[in-house]
Amino acid sequence: MSSLFCTMVEKAMGGLALKHGFQVTERGRSLIAFETTKVEMALSYDDQRSFEVGLGLSLKIDPPAQPSHSFDELLRALNVPANEWSTGYAARDVEAAETIVKKMAGILERHAALLLNADPDAWVKLGEQRRSDCIAYAATTKMAHAKRAADEAWVAKDYQKVVAALEAVASELGKADAAKLAYAKRAVSP
């Protein structure tokens, strides 16, 4: 299976790899890695559990600053239209994985040439996308924790805890949760 996957990826990525100077640096059971003097790209296929194809892209720096950027990050940072990538990553077999890898190669060719050629501005933009994603994730997680704590306190009619949970995120609350906070504040006011 692995050699079939690696052979298929080499064929599907061949034109892209040649155009941007990538060489195969690693072939494993279900992983193949390419690199230039400045960029690393790895494709993997989990044929044991998730049956998903993965792609990671990273700028070669010493020491490596972060994990490689996922294909999802690339799609967001490059503003790839949804109609170009309307599929997921699951592939029940190597033939289905080949379809996914070919789509990935096409998107990289059309949208990621600057990244593949190690353009500093393109990599800064990709890094900014990751930071933006992290900030959004942290805000979403903070809100979810606050709402969960407030909901538990609400059921217990512990309005002091409702206020404590929601006050930190008050500016981000929707109408219903803002009303819940206002009610809880009135309930604990002397």
Regions inferred by a protein language model and the residue ranges of each:
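Intrinsically disordered, low-complexity regulatory regions enriched in serine/threonine/proline
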Residues: 1-12, 24-190
